[in-house]
Amino acid sequence: MQQRLPSLLEHPVAFAHRGGKAHAPENTIEAFRLGLKLGATGLESDVWLTSDGVPVLEHDGVVRSRFSRRAIGDLRRNQLPSFIPTLAELIDECGTSYHLSLDLKAPNVGLRVLDVVGEVGPELLPRLWLCEPLWQDLLPLRDHAEGAKLVDSTRLSRIKEGPERRAATLASEGIDAINLHHTDWSGGLVTLFHRFDICAIAWDLQFEHLLRPILRMGIDGVHSDWVDRMMDAYRAELGAPQL
């Protein structure tokens, strides 16, 4: 059996992707509650801004009806379906005893996220992970992060300068983590980013036979739709989950 490599985090994070979309309608309070009930130590979602500046959790950023499609950014909060939760509602309903990873989907949404979390759940800030596909878009958040983690969410094939140069750049620019598809990761690549104190996160891990080897690589976080499978693998490799 592969020897387990060390993680940067004392307790790697098990993120329920969109709340654990295999178990309940994605990005709903029902899904987020269930993901935590099934043992996830983190929740994942996408965050958009309504036209009146409210951060809401939804994947596509589009509200569909029988005859139309409207962008969330063109609608006020009170025009959205009730099943689309606001960030504040997530915190009100689920508390703050978990990690929260958010893909930032709208201009300036990161600053509003930090404002809302600071207002309604400041104890969540050290466990808040803010993700962008262009790491440069995270730079305006550095002076406002209040302990939140900034995450370069990309693919290995897009890192044209090579992973070592990217790791060095992220470290020098104050970015905390990199999030790659699980097929991009190897034990050596995890170790490389750890040398620069960059956390290594993996996504799209739907089966135990994929989860267990990547946890042994020393990965710092995993994302899965199937929370039960993820937690079975986590306990088998790392023991009881903790924050």
Model feature map: region roles:
Residues M1-L243:
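Phosphate-group recognition and catalysis centered on beta-loop-alpha active-site segments
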